[in-house]
Structure formats: structure tokens, C-alpha cells
């Protein structure tokens, strides 16, 4: 019972955040961030948990949107799939965090390889160009993550609330998709810094408001931001030596919500939903008025009672 009472808040945070996002159009990571902060997450706990949640949850999303057969894998087709599985087991025996991240990284790369192959060969960027964009985004995510430790614990909730307001303002101001093409890439890179600082991944909002014509970065943004978040997740672990086991249970709750209710589909023509923006702004303002107290995440017994998850 002690274990269940410890993981239940995380599971419910993922589930309720996903369901609320599904029916309002608010970005899922925004909802879960507010849930985590309301649970009492401290800044370092929060950013580590959010990066973990984003990487794992969008692995679930992309694996459903791009269904793949083992034989069609690019890097490890067929029986070769045993190679990353065995490596995952070996890494998990040494360091569970590294093992888990490697597992997700492997399958995300397979999914993104499929997405890359499906792009128009004449307009898709080179693999080197994608790598360059991932590195730039990863540096920005890591810088944001490194700055988290300098934010006073009692005021970190303001970072989350203000970030949501910034996203809402940008979505409101960028309704004309034919304008802003010159600075859209700068905005996308700036969003990766906000991801590292707040844990909010605005991919669904940003891709819904893509410019016309669309830039190379915009076309590949899901690949770029997820690659950057994986690197940022590893960097956060190196800096803070903190692994949020609870975030994994939040991911499970989110996966259940996605399976039961699906995902909100933003329209790709016209302006962004004013109703969604209104709800997001209201949620952010109410949240900042509440002023959650950073008492720390609930302790998951498994993380303390066994050496396997002793970080």
C-alpha cells in the first residue's frame, strides 16, 4: 500500500494532465508541469522529471502515429533487435537510468529514421544538417537546465507560469502563417531553451502554427527537439545526479490517457484556437495566484529500499 500511495500521485498527474490536454488543446507538458509543481516539486526535481516525461511520452505518441514492424527497422531490423535489448539490459545492470534512456533513444531513432525516409527526397535536409540542428538545440536545452539550479525554489512556479503565458502570446501573435518566416527558426530555437528551463515542450503548438513556406528546421522540429531533450536529460543527470522514478509512472498514466482518449488535433489553417489560449492563460494565472510550496516530490519507496534504483 505504501508503494501504491507513493506512485499514485505521479500516475494521476500523467493521466489527468493528458486528459485535460486532450479536451482543451492545452499543451500536454504544460498540464503535467503544473501538476508536478502542485505536488511540491523542487526546481531540480521538476526539470529532471519533465525531461524524462517528455522523452518517454512522445516516444509513446510517435510509436502510435508511425506504426513500425520489426523487419522494417533501419538500424536493427529483425533479429538484430536483440542487440539493443541486450545492451539495454547490460547498461541497466550498471546504471538503470542510462539503460532506460538508451532503450528509448534506440526506438526513437528507428521512428525518426522512418519519418526521414518518408520526407520528399528533394526537399529533406541532409543527415549532417539534422545533426547540426540537434546539437544547437541540445546546447540551448542544456543551458536552460543548468540555470534551473539558480532559480529560488519558492519562485520556480513563476518560471512555469510565465513560460505558458509566453507561448500563449506567441500563438496569438503568429496567426498569419505567411508572416514571420524570417524569424520563425529563431523562435523554435528559443523554445528549446525554454524546454530546458521549464520542461515545457511546445512541439504540438509550434508545429500547428508552422510558417508557409516551411523551413527545414520546422519540418524536422520533432526530431530536433526530442534529440535535444535526450541529451538534456543526460546532462541533467550528470549535473544533478537525480533520476525521477515517479516520472516513469507519470508516463504510464499519460500512455493510458492517450490510449483511452487519443490526442487533441490542432487545426493547421487559420489562427490558433482562442478558446485554448484563454484556458491556458487562465490556468497559468490561477496557478501563480495559488503559489504552490516546493516541499519536494513524494518519496517512491522502491527508490530508497533497493540499490537498483539508489541514485
Regions found by a protein language model. Give the residues of each.
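Short hydrophobic/aromatic, small-residue-rich stretches within specific transmembrane helices
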Residues: 50-54, 130, 221-225, 247, ...
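Short, low-complexity cationic-aromatic patches
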Residues: 25-27, 202
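Generic alpha-helix structural propensity
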Residues: 27, 31, 47-50, 54
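Membrane-interface alpha-helices at helix entry/exit sites of multi-pass transporters
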Residues: 41-51, 73-76, 212-224
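Juxtamembrane transmembrane-helix boundary motif
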Residues: 1-22, 29-45, 61-196, 235-311
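Short secondary-structure transition/capping segments
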Residues: 56-59, 229-230
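Short active-site-proximal "capping" loops at secondary-structure junctions
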Residues: 37, 52-57
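Structural signal for alpha-helical transmembrane segments and their flanking helix-loop junctions
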Residues: 185-236
